[in-house]
């Protein structure tokens, strides 16, 4: 059985899919929104789960069941159309939805910056409005056509101002500005009583206008009688006294024939009825006024008989002047003379108008009165006189405002929501005439206006179709040429240039990836395979479905409805609404809630769209691709296994049987080879379930030589997964070796651990050789042991090696027991003659040693040279001895030692009977005395305060100071008092380091001390009691704040630390050791890291340990290479610095003379090893060589040529070393000349000489290799990284040092406090943000820090003055005498004094420095040092030790990029962030290319162009300089050079394309940038890794536009695609290794660890 590692996927490419590609992916169109039939539970045909499209639901069976079985594979059923294949097809087969209208892709529209908007030069808001068929709110004037002339308008047509302006450009017509009526009062009521008259006319805009006239009239009534003749007509004017009716005589009536009369008194008529024999008809006479009938009713009369009396009608004279009005009931007969005769009695009137009112009413308003109707004041005349929003011309407005003042208001502008459209095509002549361009957004009304003026010459659309048409019309090559031409004319820093560069980037990306812009608008929508969006039947016959199905259903339903509407030719407004809803549905399917309102389910939960499925913690990337589930794994509670060896674990039998099942079955099946394999497996599986004894036997056999992996979550570093040899045990819990608890951070209070079984021989080999717990004793974070004894083992060893308090006082001659060897002592102990802690004399290696038997026992397990018979071993002692064993004897001996310590520790912890009671917490009698003294001091401070000698702040600080000192005194005294009895159990625990510390002891037996309030400020009142005595109520209350804050912090800390680790891992995940040596001569200077408040962050010893020298180390004073006298090791370049070297170099210092005078013999061919210069001027034939000229070979040559034999010189042996004293003062002791860790240059040496300083202590200058200066193109090299701290050997190629660094920094993250300490001024620092927030602040290079900003020195110099006026200022004089002024911000304190020497980057005040400013002023080296110092400081303060190289790796990634300022002639764009190494490489290539220009010009003459060349000429036109396939001639070449074409693509003889440079190119100019870790992760070149980190949608959008290819260089990318990571054994150089599994006896395996 063999296996080898080969990576199969070389790269992953992501692009924008064209509609054709989407259709090609698809196996059929999804036409219905149905999913599963509720009766048959089978997928609906053409639905979202259709078997015809996505494949069969049952393995190898079609939908109708006609074809079933693997033999029919590939057959398409003619009945149901389903292809017979595996049901796995439902995981990979796509469908698609053919959209009835195009739809924009939300990622390309709502990205930042929006790709579509950038390409079209439109705003995202406009595009969104167009895509969503929206409108634009417009405020504008309105006009009314008053004279249309020869236009299609009619009088009264209403136009908006913009419409009018458009029409007015071409047509001649007259308009009047319109006023828009608002709030007209209604109804219209009469102001007076009177009679109504209605008139009607037309306005000048041909609109109807009604006049309601109400007249208030006084009337004189005159009666008129039948027969009277009226002298005046209706409406005639009369004057008082005029005769209206003249006097008239009325004759009597005589009967015309014989007959009978009927007299009707009511109607005042007489009717004569003729006799029956007569032929006459009846005649009726009206009786005039004043005439009487002379006959009775029914009386017979003769012809000629008088029937009535005669009378005279008097005249009627007008009593008043006025207008004659006839009553409506008056019955008149016109006479020939034009007058009227009254036929019936009635009345006429003389009217006088008292009042008249006119009411104009506009057309359409309902009138409520009739002509002639009488009305009262307040009666309604009409519903209204004007309608709301009625538009009036100026004349109309004036008319109405005259008649209705204050009864309505008008606005001159109208506010409207107008649908907007975008111009998709326009005739160039029209464009020039109107100034409208393609892509301009206009309102629908404006578009209609343009269409009427320029029919067929302008096109506008709305919706996604408009965007699609615009994108289709983009010629990317032309656009690129236009942008390039414009960029040449404008300054690169202008806003326009930045905008153009963004656009240029997108255009270039689209060209390079061969993507058509219109593909960003979807025509077909892919439907993901149904198994990725399943439906599951739940109880009650209902179905639970994935949100995606709901979103797809909504799209399909809307799409189908739109298709129907289009077929029916539905009105545009309905179609538009449906298109908008379709766009919304697709948007929400892709990214729910990005535009508009998110879709939610019935519980109000937002539905998960495609974007949500891939982004975030629960998304596809992080949950499924980076976090995979593991087969062959189990999980159980852990218990301690004290009997185990360090590389063993106890595995419960049942669990092992389950894990190793296939192996056990394989072993069982080897015995018999009869039945078919399938049935055999079933049979053996049953045996296993029955727990057959044979199975246990085989399990024992199978388990031999195999290791399992144990993992405890959270997996914070690589030690959280280790390999162990399993030992089968009874029970259900995994047994864990106690010493591996620290790396796992495990305890036995219910923790659970997971077991994983590596299957292949390769995996087993890797687990055994690299992951076995015995090889993981040393931590890769700091190189010290991590698998360490703790708790009872430490207590046991301490108890074993401790002594009585009088031990030191007993003289050897007074000791009773003396032994010749340890065996004798053991015998005496066994027989009870001596006790463990009794002093004895014992002979060891021929030496008599005073010790105790306990110490003899413990030393017997140690390597001989590490034994110490006079030492009590606590936690640190054990750690030291373990570390020394590892250094001298290697990892295997260390593992054995740890096991021995464990056994001894447990044994003697048991024997000690360690237990504690309340009495063991003893309180020192001196405690009260100390507190009383403190109280007195406090009283004094109070008195000073009361006298006004101290301010509030000063009093507070002094109080805090006193109580802090007191608390420390009480702590020390309590510990001393407890230690008087070394066997006190509490003391044993604390002193040994097994449990607890002095601080806890102080609280239990001393005093609790000062507490902080909720804001973090220290409370002045201390807690004087301890827990043994009990707290008072006030004390208890004070202490609650801290306790509560502690709990809150812990909760916050965990998540913050986890997130920090995640970002750190992401930023360095691809950093792997890629080569043994990058060959760089750069390095970093080893220095003592001190913070601004003189807190030593790191000693030189720790700084250089585990590194490789970058330069030789020279001995100060002699210039020879430094040699370690203890080991005879020379410190030349490439030497690895181990522990002992680091100690030697850090402690090495030497007093060296500042200056020495000497004579240089020029006849000997040497120049001094140290810096030297001429002591006097020397005249030579070639000229004067002045004194103080440095002596080098040039000077020596000149002097020899002048025949000079020897010269007087000054040697400065101190130059090139580093000051090792604290401070060197000038002769007046006012000014510091040199400070510790300052490099000595010539200027400083001379300054020391001037101040008569003869000699100083210096140390050699040490430069070590660092990842910060590594020049490997990918990853880092082994020499720059140095030692692999987990084994103290130079790191191997392939080690994933990035992830180790991130884990080393992230793992202790939870130990860092969240708290911002407010120390109340005890500490020398101001209130500095500490803990996790500070680390994050630095890694994220925050622009705003929580602390006030401090200032730093930009030069090397001396503080000459500090002015205290506001604002304070610090003045620094540099070495050349220049003065630099620094203004001190208000919230910080000055940290320097006058006369103090400062170095560049040194903090002058309290507060934190802005890292970006350091980078700008002092460059990347100082920035890296500051970051390292500040980040490391937080960890050191919390007692966490992490090697610098881990921080440096992160800082390297933060400083790895530079921002392009001027791209020169490269593909980069200004603002691009590019790795420094790449920029340097590109610039190098440009310089090399520039050298070949002349040669290339000659080469291309006579060759064919492989690509056409287009440029923009001086007139702004795009022209083609040369066509594809054209031959390059001298003339063409000159033309190309004239137009500044720098590169041409030529066809070579093999018809392949080659690029030739024909003009020199400009290099890239850039500036170093500091990236915060989040940004550094996102700027990572591989898109897969960046997408899986954060802002997934943004990263994928950008990558798709670019057509980005991920070459899978990092670790994450390879995990995502499911192949071996390019690190460790997966690194390329190991890829061909073959692993063979040879049958080996378990015995041999055991012997190795025996």
Curated annotation (Swiss-Prot):
Gene name tied to this protein: rpoC
SUPFAM superfamilies named among the record's database cross-references: beta and beta-prime subunits of DNA dependent RNA-polymerase
InterPro entries in alphabetical order: DNA-dir_RpoC_beta_prime, DNA-dir_RpoC_beta_prime_bact, RNA_pol_asu, RNA_pol_N, RNA_pol_Rpb1_1, RNA_pol_Rpb1_3, RNA_pol_Rpb1_3_sf, RNA_pol_Rpb1_4
Subunit structure: The RNAP catalytic core consists of 2 alpha, 1 beta, 1 beta' and 1 omega subunit. When a sigma factor is associated with the core the holoenzyme is formed, which can initiate transcription.
Gene3D superfamilies in the record: 1.10.132.30, 1.10.150.390, 1.10.1790.20, 1.10.40.90, 2.40.40.20, 2.40.50.100, RNA polymerase II, clamp domain, RNA polymerase Rpb1, domain 3
Lineage: Bacteria, Thermotogati, Thermotogota, Thermotogae, Thermotogales
CDD domains: RNAP_beta'_C, RNAP_beta'_N
Name of the protein in question: DNA-directed RNA polymerase subunit beta'
Binding residues annotated for Zn(2+) 1, in chain numbering: 62, 64, 77, 80
Organism, scientific name: Fervidobacterium nodosum (strain ATCC 35602 / DSM 5306 / Rt17-B1)
